[in-house]
């Protein structure tokens, strides 16, 4: 019976053809049922209810503050289940304002952080695979070109050891936007981890989005975030 499940896994992902170690000690029934390969291991990858195949919605700028009996919106709206979230209020940027100038309004920016941790063994992967074979781990994300600031998006992905703290490999991305010409679209971010050394057991995925409040609230959205483990690795050259 165990052999049948092992054969099913081999047939499903061509593990033997890719040179994946397949020890008999692995619970192949569990591997087949959890399906750890070629699927998104992140929970709730589109918390704003949008996807990158449709242009991001244009913001409605009325310029009218909320009624005095209603508190202003300071946090984004969405379903953030599966994500740990945090908001960091940034100081007002007064650079470039001459001394003595009377300021009526300044935009206030905030970083909104979403993060989650993927347990690779709970997802169905096994020690020999992660330590000896080291399959490719593909990261993808799409963020909205909101034009709220030159820095509106940050990505930080860490491959962690069994203690959930030791960083074995890390990828960060901190782009700067061109605000000279108006553009409002989705921007793709991607990275492939390979040859990352033995010991990886968790993936910590974090991205930060910059929001703005000035009379009204405007945010930067993100969508279709993914962490996918491939049943393959780069060929040796």
From Swiss-Prot:
Signal peptide: none annotated. The keyword Cytoplasm applies. It comes from the Eukaryota. It is found in: Cytoplasm. SUPFAM superfamilies: Galactose-binding domain-like (SSF49785). GO terms for cellular component: cytoplasm; SCF ubiquitin ligase complex. Its main location: cytoplasm. Residues 64-74 have a biased composition (Pro residues). Residues 40-82 are annotated as: Disordered. Expressed in nonspecific cytotoxic cells (NCC). InterPro entries: F-box-assoc_dom (IPR007397), F-box_only (IPR039752), Galactose-bd-like_sf (IPR008979). The keyword Cytoplasm applies. GO terms for biological process: ERAD pathway; glycoprotein catabolic process; SCF-dependent proteasomal ubiquitin-dependent protein catabolic process. Residues 31-231 form the FBA domain. Keywords: Cytoplasm. May promote cell proliferation. This is F-box only protein 50. It comes from Danio rerio (Zebrafish).
